[in-house]
Every structure is written in C-alpha cells, then in structure tokens.
Design a protein with these regions (language model features):
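Short, internal strand/loop/helix patches
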Residues: 90-128
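Conserved redox-active cysteine motifs that mediate thiol-disulfide chemistry
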Residues: 48-65
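Bacterial N-terminal signal peptides
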Residues: 11-25
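Thiol-/selenol-based redox modules, centered on thioredoxin-like
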Residues: 124-158
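Short pre-active-site segment immediately N-terminal to redox-active cysteine/selenocysteine motifs
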Residues: 42-44, 48-52, 118
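N-terminal secretory signal peptides that target proteins for export/translocation
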Residues: 1-10
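Conserved helix-turn-beta segment immediately C-terminal to the redox Cys motif
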Residues: 42-43, 60-80, 94
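Boundary at the C-terminal end of the N-terminal hydrophobic targeting segment
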Residues: 29-33
Length: 158
C-alpha cells in the first residue's frame, strides 16, 4: 500500500503528509478553509474534482453511497473543487448533488499542498492521520478495490 503512495506522491510530500495529513489547516482569501483537525480519529476520503471532469461526475453517486453507508462507522467524504469559476461548480452540483462536504479551492492552494495532478484524485486518510491510499481517476470497475481499502481502515482500531 505504501509503495503505491510512494510511486504517486513525491517523496517529500509523502513524508510530510504521512505525518501531517489530519493536522492540515489551510485557508486563504480565495479558498474555503479546510481544517482536517476536526476529523481526527475518523477516516477521511478526500476527493479533488472539477466541473469539466467526466469521471468526477461518475464518482459522485458512489461517494454519496460511501457517506450514507459508512458515515456512522467513522468515514467522512470531503470533495475539494478546483474550478476557478464557482458558478461552474454550482451548476455541476445542481446536476450531480453531493451528500457530503464540498470545499472550494479556486486558487488551487489545497490541491497544491497535496501535489494533485489529475482529476479526480482521491486520498484515503486513516484515523492515524496517515495517507493510506491515493488513486487518480475514477473507474467504476475498480470500486471494489477502492472499497477494500476503505473497509480495511474501518476495521482498524478506533
């Protein structure tokens, strides 16, 4: 699992965020604050998306299901939108509603902290604050693989 993260993330970013993922608090005049310290002790599925991204549209119903089915077990889904034009994100959300927290990052500040290069990119952060899994893109046929990683963390010690 760690090898997958190492191949995707830059070594420095990996080292930093393995230790600090749940302690990150970012805000600016352009971005909404994202204070992951509020989710300490929970599992966070952090998804970066954009309105123009077709796979993002496919992932939203699945993320809604994740939040609905596993929220009571400690899973929190947070989607970070990177559109520069908030109206485009709002249009997307009218067509594809989100039953989870959505944060806007038009400046790319939050995405930059995680070195996000593709849409969608999702990070699975454990109760321990470490990034356990990173995947770029969303392939419906890989949902079982994604879910296996989530289930593993849900079974982990509270």
């Amino acid at each position: 699992m760690i090898r997958l993260v190492q191949r995707i993330a830059r070594p420095f970013a990996l080292q930093t965020f393995l230790l600090l993922a749940l302690f990150l608090s970012i805000s600016s005049a352009q971005a909404q604050p994202l204070d992951l310290t509020a989710y300490r002790g929970r599992i966070v599925y952090l998804d970066f998306w954009a309105s123009w991204c077709a796979p993002c549209r496919l992932s939203f119903p699945w993320m809604n299901q994740l939040q609905q089915l596993y929220g009571s077990q400690g899973l929190v889904v947070i989607a970070v939108n990177v559109d520069r034009d908030r109206a485009k994100a709002d249009d997307f959300l009218r067509e594809t509603p989100a039953g989870f927290k959505v944060v806007y990052d038009p400046s790319g500040q939050i995405a930059g902290k995680y070195d996000i290069k593709a849409m969608p990119t999702s990070l699975l952060i454990g109760r321990d604050g470490k990034i356990h899994f990173v995947h770029s893109g969303f392939l419906p046929e890989k949902r079982d693989e994604y879910l296996a990683h989530i289930a593993e963390l849900l079974r982990s010690a509270q």
